[in-house]
């Protein structure tokens, strides 16, 4: 990654954070930073069979579960194949998963995901047969069926070589699931509703309670950094109350944190990161070892002479010049840090090491989280 590109990225990041620092944009709606109790997806799972594959399905010899499932399915259709020798590669055993949205009504549709279990090469062109989807309680909440879309492309030549783009062993069926049973959650009958902060914080929790109490006195209580409990005022049901408070705006707070992805060389940090007085020096040391073997031959007409390879090594050590010492005063901001490191020509991967060293020295007033 070139330094000019790094400087451009840093400039855009600083510009974005400068805009975000405006008070009007710092506030968020309550419904964007909390999750309401009971308003969540429920995960469903089922076992099924995909048919219609063009020779890319399970080999029944290596996938006995597929053979057993196929025989059982055909017997339910009145076809007896127990005494026959099934030898098809057009079917595949799959797991079907889906998320049941909150407040879903019977008859509504949802997307489902299909993934192979056996040694099938691709689900491209296959059709999932009707499959029951169950929840963690073992009850059936939906059924799924339909054509599987993998989003992958495969091409092969006569020599046997092939190229595949995407993952052909997993796919989706858009609106392939039909909800048969509702979860039974009734928010309207609740007396107290708990809201869970997506990013737990004492200050944010208190601010949410204060904003709600400013509109509906005595109706909200911050129980901890994660939970804010609310109770609708007299004469108002829970649905109407939630509708009234979810659009109230709050300025969320969060502890200073630096997120580092060492594999990709990505660094993300907020504008509230502060650094105590510290001096930083960074330089690059390059060690180069080159092997230039030479051939040694005996003189003409000599006896007992042999041609041998003589190793010749060239070792050089080069230290990059021109680096200066960067000094940051106490309370230095993110802008000062990035500007100073950019002036030193520091790459993102070097910055990761520098930030970790600053944290180890006790000068970085933020938490470092390595992904």
Swiss-Prot record:
Keywords: Bacterial flagellum, Periplasm, Signal. This is Flagellar P-ring protein. The keyword Signal applies. One of its GO terms (cellular component) is outer membrane-bounded periplasmic space. Belongs to the FlgI family. PANTHER family: FLAGELLAR P-RING PERIPLASMIC PROTEIN FLGI, FLAGELLAR P-RING PROTEIN. Residues 1-21 form the signal peptide. It comes from the Bacteria. It is found in: Periplasm; Bacterial flagellum basal body. Assembles around the rod to form the L-ring and probably protects the motor/basal body from shearing forces during rotation. GO terms for molecular function: structural molecule activity. Disulfide bonds: none annotated. One of its GO terms (biological process) is bacterial-type flagellum-dependent cell motility. The keyword DNA-binding does not apply. Pfam families: FlgI. The gene is flgI.
């Amino acid at each position: 990654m070139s330094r000019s590109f790094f400087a451009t990225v840093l400039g855009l990041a600083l510009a974005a954070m400068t805009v975000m620092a405006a008070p009007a944009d710092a506030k968020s709606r309550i419904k964007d930073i909390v999750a309401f109790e009971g308003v969540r997806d429920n995960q469903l799972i089922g076992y099924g069979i995909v048919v219609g594959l063009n020779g890319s399905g399970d080999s029944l010899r290596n996938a006995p579960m597929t053979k057993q499932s196929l025989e059982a399915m055909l017997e339910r259709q009145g076809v007896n194949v127990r005494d026959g020798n099934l030898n098809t590669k057009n079917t595949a055993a799959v797991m079907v998963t889906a998320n049941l949205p909150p407040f879903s009504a019977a008859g509504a549709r949802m997307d489902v995901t299909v993934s192979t279990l056996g040694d099938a090469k691709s689900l491209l062109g296959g059709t999932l047969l009707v499959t029951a989807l169950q929840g963690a309680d073992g009850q059936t909440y939906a059924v799924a069926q339909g054509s599987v879309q993998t989003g992958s492309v495969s091409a092969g030549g006569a020599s046997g070589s092939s190229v595949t783009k995407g993952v052909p062993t997993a796919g989706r069926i858009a609106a392939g699931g039909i909800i048969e049973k509702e979860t039974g959650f009734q928010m309207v009958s609740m007396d107290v509703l708990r809201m869970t902060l997506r990013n737990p914080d004492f200050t944010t929790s208190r601010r949410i309670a204060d904003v709600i109490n400013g509109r509906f006195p005595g109706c909200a209580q911050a129980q901890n950094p994660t939970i804010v409990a609310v109770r609708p005022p007299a004469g108002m049901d829970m649905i109407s109350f939630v509708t009234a408070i979810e659009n109230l705006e709050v300025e969320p707070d969060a502890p200073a944190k630096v997120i580092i992805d060492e594999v990709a060389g990505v660094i993300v940090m907020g504008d509230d990161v502060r650094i105590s007085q510290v001096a930083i020096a960074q330089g690059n040391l390059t060690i180069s070892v080159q092997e230039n073997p030479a051939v040694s031959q005996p003189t003409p007409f000599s006896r007992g002479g042999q041609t041998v390879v003589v190793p010749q090594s060239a070792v050089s050590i080069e230290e990059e010049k021109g680096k200066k010492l960067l000094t940051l005063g106490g309370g230095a901001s993110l802008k000062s840090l990035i500007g100073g490191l950019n002036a030193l020509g520091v790459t993102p991967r070097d910055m990761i090491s520098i930030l970790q060293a600053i944290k180890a020295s006790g000068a970085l007033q933020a938490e470092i989280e390595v992904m």
